[in-house]
Amino acid sequence: MSEPTGLPPLLRVTSVTVAAPDPRALAEFYSRLLGWEIAVTEPARPGFPAEDGWAQMAPPPGQVGPTLNFEYEQDYVPPVWPSEPGRQQLQTHLDIAVAEVGVAVAWAESVGARQAAHQPQEHVRVMLDPVGHPFCLFLSD
């Protein structure tokens, strides 16, 4: 094993994994929202509920970015946003650049998202996916 040089080794984020009570259904939502194809799915494991499984989406050709993975969480509890003491906390969220916030909000709602009650910024809209994960639509430069 080599000694550290003081510089970080090459580390590259390749995926973001999202917990879901039905990962294939949530992948379908994000596929419609983003226009990405679902690249891989896995069925429920033997002895697990039908919702068990896994799905992965990759950016379309020409777009650079990590894959989005969706994995089964049997005891999934939707996060509360903004956070409240003693309630399920947000672990991560997606920021999605858009050309027009209003158009993007309408699109997101048409495929199954809803706007969060709290909207802290004028040029950003906090949306909730079908299982309650927040994601932000923000005006790109």
Language model region names:
Residues D129:
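Short, acidic, Ser/Thr-enriched surface-loop or helix-capping motifs
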Residues S2-P9, W81:
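A detector for short, charged/polar N-terminal pre-domain segments
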Residues G6-L11, T17-L68, V103-A106, S110-H118, ...:
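Core segments of cupin and vicinal oxygen chelate
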Residues V13-S15, T92-H93:
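Short active-site oxyanion
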